[in-house]
């Protein structure tokens, strides 16, 4: 009877030793016979149980014969299952580790052999050893010894390349101190074996491990003995890193023969690259300078792009789901002890999430920043598979996110650069391709210093690569991205031109011409600074180069040259360091590429010249004789405009190269047709530009001969005929551009009909016409008229040449979307043209198409080609939103936030106008409440850090939204409250008056939109926010009332129209508000039925309501509350406390009469009890939690601000002209860096006023004074800076409580003043800092100072420590205890500072701490060395003797 798995499982589980020994050999025979054990692989559960039984019952048996037999059975299983046994390794490994410590030598040897066999057949050495680290800490000393012996055996079988030895060496070092001598000896032997395979790096590594010198001496002696014995076995990866032949895994000049010599010499099997193909065999056609040249394992950009989508499909259900996925990925990647396959899976999952739309979630970029460390760790991994996947993922992130990947790119770039000299091809080429992809897609100026710093590397290979990267950067990036680092680029290129390596010099000369295209003036200065031999080399490089990228790009468009259009992404460098001329090779192979000159004007120009340049035998012959000043002919061809504002259309391409194989039929113009075209005027005004050398290789003569020449009086004579004519560039022997390719009369008729229809539609709808043309290229009317020649070039072409064929097939949406998603900017632009045509034809997109288009548009917001693609994208976006607005609700958040962010970018004025138009259309297309909620969410999002321009854009948008919203759209939610509180803080933005004004206008607009709801919202905010908003609203209402009394005709109601197109100008600061008339935003305020008395009554209601919600935040708001008429008169003082002293305060008694309802009938909720509730019967309702941020020493001040005096006497004590004086002083102080003497006088006057206790002045002007003073600290004149600090110090003395909300800003600015070069300013800053330390609450002060002490440089850290010392002298012991963990690290860091003054200040501060808390400080000083501790004790004793009245734990809390 034939036994199956069930039978053998029963035999394995039996306990009888005799039967086990009898059954064992039969089981081995069964397992090795595939016919008998055919069911072995069919039932995984039975197999798992069988392996588990063998590991626990047999291998762990106390009978050594059974243990040996168990290992033999496992060995048979490994032989049978091979790779499939890997899943069982975790089951058997613990038992095998235990057996390494068996008392029997035969068991230990058999165990070791089995482990080696598993490494070879079922797994690989690294996989196994990552799971065997626990053996180094095993409780059995024989096991610890056995693990070391097993490592020696592994090295002898597989070599050092198979293991990440850096992870194993620390475990071995720990065993050097093992209590057992056998283990210690085994550990030393292990290190010696590693030294045999790795070499001197082990010696250097051990020196850093902190081992005792005596032990190191023993080990190093053994190393020397091995070296002398001649038994060293060095692997290829361990050669000197400066060896040119082994450094660069991707050298362009390395021959294929050298690649074979560097093949890995490990015995282990090759591991698949993870993409289901072998390297070097993925493409049937050989690549130019491709894999054969790079060597086995090399990768290129094509491999990367294919691998981008080689990731499992995942779905993202929510932002929470995304966050959890990224957290798991970070956890795996941050720990290199995880299985390498898990780490590869984690890296692939990042790509999966990207493909699933992770970038659309708000929290993605915050989580991505947290992955920087994990990416760096993965890129440094010793396993090439992990490095490869890490590099692919980084490249994918860069290509998808573009400039949004700036932080990640900057973080990982140095690590990726370290891969370039790696001798392992797959690692070196992965690093190179990653850097190229990052340079192509992430145009961040901060990357430039990283690249240029590597241009001075000791490694020749790295220098060569860096200059190639620099060349690519100069081709791909726009000029504005490079401007910040012009000098660095120039200096780097200069070093490259002088480089010792000839190939590096060649590439550096190429970089020079790229640099010249961006910064011709600086390039010419660099040229003059070079020796004559180098100047000649530069000129001869330009003359002789076959490269089509050796010249600067037209308008920095890399894609406008043939180099970018025909280049596959994996374009390799030729041995000379230049790119192989692609146009020529393409023509010979017959694979025709689409010309892009129908999109870009400069590409059209080059295509024309390409055909014409064949007549000149030496196109660069005149360059060498040119002086540097004449290089303008080599630079960019710029589009110049006529005074009429129109520019001419571009010519179509020389030949249609869309891959059609049929014969080309060229349509010719008739003689005399349109020879007097109005476009002729354009060319005549642009003379004098000589034909510059072109970047396009000459077209073969057989190609040119197929293009018929225009004869006689044809339009060849028309100056508008070609782009070159229009720009006044002369050319020898021009030929006309080829017409569109038409294969039949049917095609011709269709093309004519389309051309006429397009022309007709453009004449009827002028605005629409622009959407078919690239930004900034508007044709003359003649070009688009119905009367144009049917066969003319312009009849077939839109502004940029031939209409792409899919424009006539509007149904082909997929092709349009594919073009829009292309990585080539010109294809993206072509796609946008097609999309505009689709939208114009009212072709509605399906839900799937909409989703994909939204994803594409999300990426386009970061498109780097602002002149070319982004501008057209904005035009298309407007049409898209108008047509599909009902289906875009889910995409509104991205749309709105991205447009607002773009308003903060440095864009051309015309592009910014298009962004504004897109915002206007968005505002009118979607529900207002939804937009408002999105904006509130965006404002409070902690991951967003909008710059000042973006803040202004957000605020202006909210203001315009509030004008059109219904009152019910404004909802008092927690998100809205947070957003409003942030807007209130923006009203004091120190860096921008625009932000301050815009924030004030928004608060007023929201107040006017829904007064009751906004009042309730304010009541729920902390008191500081309430005060700021209430004061602003009070001033607004007061000014509105004064203005409306002066010009009653201006008092109009709110505009009810939802689509109002009028936009209000920003409101000026309340203190500077004109009283003569209403600002546009004030006009909307509903004052139609209110006279002056009613407005004051309204104000009382508002302020009273705010006070109510402050003191009764826990009481049900709907509970009817009686108004106490006796206390109503107190509200009159609100006006006195908040209004401008210069305001007209007539009718003070009228204000307190009548007890009117607030604003309108909807505000009945605002009838509340007076603000002094906590002194009356309702005191029990006071909620201390709402005032938890108050500090005891400021309770009086807070009370004074919250409760106003009974009458207006306080204000009447202040002369009205006094406030005018302050306003004049502030106006004078705002003249920064001008009128020095006048401002000195103003500061002196302000110094006098600060010494007067004038509450009303400070109530109104404090913020403005403080901001102006802090701004004045950056003045050019040192005397003014010093004077500003003295005024600040005086205010600190007299008004300390007011600095509570500005402590951090004031402290930072004061400390920064210590860096001043003038002693007078530094002295004033020291005095101000000293006063600050005594004026601001100690705990608040220390919280600000601690991070400064830890991060700032000298002398700021010194000033901060001194200031902290003064603060500590006045803090209580209990409070100091709580913040001690924050204080001590910075002081210990200062104790180690290189500046002696910082060390001394740190010691004094520690002494001050000791004087407060005494011996309790000692535990925090454990890391101090003995000498430092002695010094500290010396100072402590000296302080105690100096102040004999104070004990070691004296309490100075009374000062606080």
Curated annotation (Swiss-Prot):
Superkingdom of the source species: Eukaryota
Any one GO CC term of the record: spindle microtubule
Biased composition (Basic and acidic residues): 1121-1130
Positions with biased composition (Low complexity): 284-296, 550-569, 603-618, 642-656, 665-679, 785-796, 1038-1050
Record SMART domains: TOG (SM01349)
Location, primary (coarse class): cytoplasm
InterPro entries listed in its UniProt record: ARM-like, ARM-type_fold, CLASP_N_dom, HEAT_type_2, TOG
PROSITE patterns according to UniProt: HEAT_REPEAT
Keywords on record: Cell cycle, Cell division, Centromere, Chromosome, Cytoplasm, Cytoskeleton, Golgi apparatus, Kinetochore, Microtubule, Mitosis, Repeat
Any one GO molecular function term: microtubule binding
GO biological process, one term: microtubule anchoring
Region spans: Disordered: 237-296, 547-728, 776-796, 1037-1080, 1121-1147
Amino acid composition bias (Polar residues), ranges on this chain: 573-594, 711-721, 1062-1074
Subcellular location: Cytoplasm, Cytoskeleton; Cytoplasm, Cytoskeleton, Microtubule organizing center, Centrosome; Chromosome, Centromere, Kinetochore; Cytoplasm, Cytoskeleton, Spindle
Residue spans of the HEAT repeats: 68-87, 88-124, 163-200, 442-479, 930-967, 1260-1297, 1378-1415
One Pfam family, short name: CLASP_N
Gene3D superfamilies per UniProt: Leucine-rich Repeat Variant (1.25.10.10)
Similarity-based family: Belongs to the CLASP family.
Subunit annotation: Interacts (via C-terminus) with clip1/clip-170, and cenpe.
PANTHER family the record matches: CLASP, CLIP-ASSOCIATING PROTEIN 1
Role description: Microtubule plus-end tracking protein that promotes the stabilization of dynamic microtubules during anaphase. Plays a crucial role in chromatin-induced microtubule formation. May also act at microtubule minus ends. May be involved in the nucleation of noncentrosomal microtubules originating from the trans-Golgi network (TGN).
Designated name of the protein: CLIP-associating protein 1-B
Organism: Xenopus laevis (African clawed frog)
Source taxonomy: Eukaryota, Metazoa, Chordata, Craniata, Vertebrata
Originating gene: clasp1b
């Amino acid at each position: 009877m034939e036994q199956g798995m069930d039978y053998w499982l029963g035999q394995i589980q039996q306990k009888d030793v005799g039967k086990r020994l009898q059954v064992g050999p039969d089981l081995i025979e069964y397992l090795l016979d595939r016919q008998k054990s055919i069911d072995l692989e069919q039932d995984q559960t039975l197999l798992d149980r069988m392996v588990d039984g063998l590991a626990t019952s047999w291998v762990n048996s106390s009978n050594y014969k059974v243990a040996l037999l168990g290992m033999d059975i496992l060995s048979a299983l490994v032989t049978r299952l091979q790779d499939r046994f890997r899943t069982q390794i975790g089951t058997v490994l613990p038992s095998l580790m235990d057996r390494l410590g068996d008392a029997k030598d035969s068991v230990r040897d058999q165990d070791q052999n089995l482990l080696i066999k598993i490494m070879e057949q079922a797994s690989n050495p690294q996989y196994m050893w990552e799971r065997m680290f626990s053996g180094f800490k095993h409780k059995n000393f024989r096991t610890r010894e056995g693990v070391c012996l097993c490592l020696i055996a592994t090295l002898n079988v597989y070599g050092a390349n198979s293991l990440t030895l850096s992870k194993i060496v620390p475990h071995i070092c720990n065993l050097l101190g093992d209590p057992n001598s056998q283990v210690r000896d085994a550990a030393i032997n292990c290190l010696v074996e590693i030294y045999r395979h790795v070499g001197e790096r082990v010696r250097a590594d051990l020196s850093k491990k902190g081992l005792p010198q005596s032990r190191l001496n023993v080990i190093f002696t053994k190393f020397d003995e091995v070296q002398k014995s001649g038994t060293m076995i060095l692997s290829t990866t361990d050669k000197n890193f400066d060896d040119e032949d082994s450094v660069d895994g991707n050298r362009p000049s390395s021959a294929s023969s050298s690649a074979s010599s560097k093949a890995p010499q490990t015995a282990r099997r090759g591991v698949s690259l993870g993409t289901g193909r072998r390297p070097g065999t993925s493409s049937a056609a050989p690549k130019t300078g491709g894999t054969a040249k790079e060597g086995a394992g090399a990768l290129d950009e094509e491999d990367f792009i294919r691998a981008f989508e080689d990731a499992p499909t995942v779905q993202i259900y929510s932002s929470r789901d995304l966050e959890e996925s990224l957290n798991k990925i970070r956890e795996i990647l941050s720990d290199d002890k995880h299985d390498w396959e898990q780490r590869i899976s984690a890296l692939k999952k990042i790509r999966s999430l990207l493909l699933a739309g992770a970038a659309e979630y708000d929290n993605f970029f915050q989580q991505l920043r947290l992955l920087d460390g994990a990416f760096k760790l993965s890129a440094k991994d010793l396993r090439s598979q992990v490095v490869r996947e890490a590099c692919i993922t980084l490249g994918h992130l860069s290509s998808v996110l573009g400039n949004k990947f700036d932080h990640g790119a900057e973080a990982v770039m140095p690590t990726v650069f370290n891969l370039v000299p790696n001798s392992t091809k797959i690692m070196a080429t992965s690093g190179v391709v990653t850097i190229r992809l990052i340079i192509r897609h992430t145009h961040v100026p901060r990357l430039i210093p990283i690249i240029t710093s590597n241009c001075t590397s000791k490694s020749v290979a790295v220098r060569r690569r860096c200059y190639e990267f620099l060349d690519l950067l100069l081709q791909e990036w726009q000029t504005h991205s490079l401007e910040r680092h012009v000098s660095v680029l120039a200096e780097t290129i200069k070093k490259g031109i002088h480089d010792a390596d000839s190939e590096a010099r060649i590439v550096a000369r190429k970089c020079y011409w790229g640099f010249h295209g961006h910064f011709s003036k600086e390039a010419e200065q660099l040229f003059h600074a070079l020796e004559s031999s180098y100047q000649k080399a530069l000129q001869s490089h330009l003359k002789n180069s076959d490269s089509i990228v050796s010249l600067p790009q037209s308008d920095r468009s890399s894609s406008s040259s043939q180099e970018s259009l025909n280049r596959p992404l994996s374009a390799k460098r030729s041995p000379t360091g230049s790119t192989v001329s692609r146009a020529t090779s393409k023509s010979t192979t017959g694979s025709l590429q689409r010309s892009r000159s129908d999109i870009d004007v400069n590409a059209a120009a080059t295509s024309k010249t390409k055909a014409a340049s064949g007549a000149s035998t030496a196109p660069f012959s005149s360059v060498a004789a040119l002086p540097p000043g004449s290089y303008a002919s080599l630079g960019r061809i710029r589009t110049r405009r006529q005074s009429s504002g129109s520019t001419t259309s571009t010519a179509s391409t020389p030949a249609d190269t869309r891959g059609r194989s049929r014969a080309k039929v060229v349509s010719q113009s008739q003689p005399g047709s349109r020879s007097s075209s109005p476009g002729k005027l354009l060319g005549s005004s642009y003379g004098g530009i000589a034909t510059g050398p072109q970047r396009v290789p000459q077209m073969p003569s057989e190609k040119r001969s197929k293009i018929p020449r225009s004869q006689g009086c044809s339009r060849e004579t028309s100056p508008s005929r070609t782009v070159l004519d229009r720009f006044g560039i002369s050319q020898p022997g021009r030929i006309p551009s080829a017409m569109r390719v038409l294969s039949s009369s049917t095609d011709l008729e269709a093309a004519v009909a389309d051309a006429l229809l397009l022309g007709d539609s453009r004449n009827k709808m002028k605005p629409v016409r622009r959407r078919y043309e690239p930004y900034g290229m508007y044709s003359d009317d003649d070009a688009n008229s119905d009367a144009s020649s049917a066969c003319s070039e312009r009849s077939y072409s839109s502004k940029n040449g031939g209409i792409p064929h899919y424009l006539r097939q509007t149904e082909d949406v997929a092709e349009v979307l594919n073009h829009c998603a292309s990585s080539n900017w010109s294809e993206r632009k072509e796609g946008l043209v097609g999309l505009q045509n689709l939208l114009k034809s009212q072709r509605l997109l399906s839900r799937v198409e909409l989703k994909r288009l939204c994803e594409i548009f999300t990426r386009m917001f970061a498109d780097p080609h602002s002149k070319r693609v982004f501008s057209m994208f904005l035009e298309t976006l407007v049409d898209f939103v108008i047509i599909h607005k009902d289906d875009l609700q889910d995409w509104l958040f991205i749309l709105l936030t991205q447009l607002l962010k773009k308003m903060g970018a440095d864009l051309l004025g015309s592009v910014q106008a298009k962004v504004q138009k897109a915002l206007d259309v968005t505002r009118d297309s979607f529900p207002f409440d939804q937009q408002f909620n999105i904006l509130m969410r965006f404002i409070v999002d902690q991951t967003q850090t909008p710059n000042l321009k973006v803040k202004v854009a957000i605020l202006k948008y909210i203001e315009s939204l509030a004008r059109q919203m219904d009152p019910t759209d404004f909802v008092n939610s927690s998100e809205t409250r947070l957003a409003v509180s942030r807007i209130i803080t923006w009203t004091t933005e120190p860096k921008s008056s625009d932000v301050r004004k815009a924030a004030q206008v928004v608060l007023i607009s929201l107040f006017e939109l829904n007064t009751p709801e906004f009042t309730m919202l304010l009541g729920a905010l902390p008191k500081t926010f309430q005060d700021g908003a209430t004061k602003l609203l009070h001033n607004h209402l007061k000014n509105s009332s004064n203005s409306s009394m002066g010009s009653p005709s201006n008092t109009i109601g709110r505009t009810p129209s939802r689509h109002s197109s009028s936009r209000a100008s920003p409101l000026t600061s309340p203190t500077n508000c004109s009283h003569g008339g209403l600002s546009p935003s004030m006009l909307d305020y509903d004052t139609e039925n209110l006279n002056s008395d009613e407005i004051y009554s309204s104000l009382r209601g508002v302020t009273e309501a705010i006070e109510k919600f402050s003191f009764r935040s826990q009481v049900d708001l709907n509970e009817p509350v009686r108004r106490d008429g006796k206390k109503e008169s107190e509200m009159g003082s609100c006006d006195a406390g908040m209004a401008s002293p210069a305001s007209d305060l007539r009718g003070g008694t009228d204000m307190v009469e009548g007890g009117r309802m607030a604003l309108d009938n909807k505000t009945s909720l605002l009838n509340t009890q007076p603000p002094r509730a906590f002194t009356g019967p309702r005191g029990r309702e006071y909620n201390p939690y709402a005032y938890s941020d108050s500090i005891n020493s400021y309770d009086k001040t807070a009370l004074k601000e919250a409760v106003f005096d009974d009458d207006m006497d306080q204000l009447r004590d202040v002369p009205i002209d006094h406030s005018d004086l302050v306003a004049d002083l502030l106006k004078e102080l705002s003249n920064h860096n001008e009128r020095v003497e006048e401002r000195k006088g103003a500061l002196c006057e302000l110094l006098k006023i600060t010494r007067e206790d004038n509450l009303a002045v400070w109530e109104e002007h404090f913020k403005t004074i403080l901001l102006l003073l802090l701004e004045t600290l950056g003045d050019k004149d040192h005397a003014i800076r010093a004077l500003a600090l003295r005024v600040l110090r005086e205010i600190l003395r007299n008004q300390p409580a007011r600095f509570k909300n500005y402590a951090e800003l004031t402290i930072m600015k004061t400390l920064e003043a210590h860096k001043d070069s003038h002693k007078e300013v530094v002295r004033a800053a020291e005095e101000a800092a000293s006063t600050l330390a005594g004026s601001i609450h100690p705990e608040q002060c220390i919280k600000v100072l601690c991070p400064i002490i830890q991060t700032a440089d000298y002398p700021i850290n010194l000033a901060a420590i001194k200031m902290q010392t003064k603060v500590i002298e006045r803090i209580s012991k209990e409070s100091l205890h709580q913040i001690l963990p924050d204080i001590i690290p910075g002081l210990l860091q200062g104790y180690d500072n290189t500046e002696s003054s910082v060390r001394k200040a740190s010691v004094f501060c520690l002494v001050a701490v000791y004087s407060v808390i005494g011996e309790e400080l000692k535990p925090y000083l454990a890391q101090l060395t003995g000498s430092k501790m002695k010094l500290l004790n010396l100072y402590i004793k000296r302080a105690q003797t100096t102040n004999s009245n104070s004990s070691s734990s004296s309490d100075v809390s009374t000062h606080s």
